[in-house]
A protein has these predicted regions:
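Short aromatic-glycine-(Arg/Gly/Cys) micro-motifs in beta-strand/loop hairpins
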Residues: 1-29, 37-40, 49, 55-62, ...
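Short, mixed-charge low-complexity intrinsically disordered segments
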Residues: 41-100, 143-147, 155-186
Length: 186
């Protein structure tokens, strides 16, 4: 497994920046049980890492899969070097398409928070930013952070999303395991 890194803005009831307010998001998404959103969706949890695309060395740290930039990076040092600093943020370690259950994998100073399902462009979360796929999963299938905690369930939802919505671009997803740093950004 390849561990990758990113930093994302926090999104919870204290969110006061431009964009959709937390209250409006909860009403729209119907995810009333969320306490915060720890997502890889760049529209909801903004990407805080800004690589210098003109610098050839930066491309050594930018993770691409196929033709897509993932907004994941190969080292935490690069994330800190190119990060837009905020008082509160999510420093994340991720694994794209893990082949084993990750909840018992221990990473120093990180806690496993669940599995995200991002579309093939690595932009939009099928779990929290598509208005719901009620034929495939229910809001109660998600944790209070908007992720799926169970490995088998994540891959089952991935499979059924595409079966039930073959024409929907955001239903063709990548399963991504997510760990969050327990002190940095908290």
């Amino acid at each position: 497994m390849t561990f990758l890194y990113t930093a994302r803005g926090s999104y919870d009831k204290t969110y006061e920046e431009t964009g959709m307010s937390w209250v409006h998001y909860i009403e729209w998404s119907k995810l009333t049980h969320l306490t915060e959103l720890v997502s890889l969706d760049g529209m909801l949890n903004e990407i805080l890492v800004e690589p210098d695309y003109e610098n050839p060395d930066d491309w050594n740290y930018i993770q691409t899969i196929g033709q897509y930039q993932t907004d994941f990076f190969t080292t935490p040092e690069f994330v800190f070097k190119r990060m837009i600093y905020k008082d509160k943020f999510n420093l994340l370690t991720v694994v794209v398409e893990p082949n084993i259950d990750c909840k018992d994998i221990k990473i120093d100073n990180y806690e496993f928070v669940g599995y995200e399902l991002l579309d093939q462009d690595f932009n939009i979360s099928a779990l929290t930013n598509c208005g719901g796929f009620d034929e495939t999963f229910q809001p109660t299938d998600l944790t209070d952070k908007g992720l799926i905690y169970d490995f088998e369930k994540a891959y089952d939802v991935k499979k059924r999303l595409l079966e039930n919505n073959p024409e929907e671009h955001h239903a063709d997803t990548n399963v991504i395991a997510v760990w969050r740093h327990i002190t940095i950004g908290r």
